[in-house]
Swiss-Prot record:
Pfam family, one: Yae1_N
Disordered: annotated segments: 1-52
Protein name, per record: Protein YAE1
Origin organism lineage: Eukaryota, Fungi, Dikarya, Ascomycota, Pezizomycotina
PANTHER family with a match to the protein in the record: PROTEIN YAE1 HOMOLOG
Amino acid sequence: MNALGDVSPHTGPTQLAAGHAPPTPPHEDPLDDIYGSAPGSPSLLGVDPLNLDHPRERTHEILSDLPSRQRALDTDAYREGLSNSKGQYVQEGFDEGYSLGANLGIRVGYILGVLQGFVAAWRGSNDNLFKDTKKVYDTAQKELAIQELLSQQWVTEEGIWNWEVHGVEDDPTFREVAEQHPVVRKWTATVESMAAQWGVDLQAVEKVHGSNEEEQS
């Protein structure tokens, strides 16, 4: 078992060690550190609040009805949402738990940034989807609060996380620990499902951030 201050944590419970200097907070381009690859985990939501199981043809029909001006605004909305979320949530995570908290902040900022883009995309185009997406975003904000992710439900007073982590190598990275937080997995799967149903290409977003996020692990 490694401490949260260690560079490469072991799978399972880990003790927070005192006296370790925190890592340098993320900086540079506001969009650099908010993009990231998401784990291919199954959705943990029992009920899909957006009813995303409607036919793909219907989804494409809805999106094709969006005026070209709105589509242009959508692109700006995704970028603005991702940019605005980055600094806030990474800093909150950094303040709460150094390396692990900062990596959780990266994932939270990414998820909420994409959801902000969805909300902006439907505003003025489809009132029902706008309201439903806004509700999803509001719920995500509450469940993904850094204080909630690092609460005693998930991390003990001694700094031990209690969710199972599987790394590519023997010692998983903090990025892997953060990605496999049950609440993060749930919302990552939700965002991926929404993007797939609405034809939003998150792969392009993920590629931009992949190498930079690796440096934060």
